[in-house]
Amino acid sequence: CPFEVIDTMYKDAFTKFEPEYILPFLKNVASSYINNDVRLSDGRIGKVVLINENALSLPIVQCEDEFIDLSKTRGLTVSAIL
């Protein structure tokens, strides 16, 4: 899943990459998934509605009428882009 790659690269941003280049790159990659349907790790299907600038791999996802901030929901992640 692309959000797992974003998470891995973000963790290495200050040790293996130049932060002034990798952080804007990761932000743009994450933002490209806004309005994409995703499957969450609990099986629910939702749509990425907003990228969290402090946790690029944990966007805000809309599942039906509920908005889920993955950065505040422990253990819940995007498992697949649909």
Spans of features found by a protein language model:
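Terminal helices and disordered tails flanking the catalytic cores of nucleotide-processing hydrolases
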Residues: 1-82
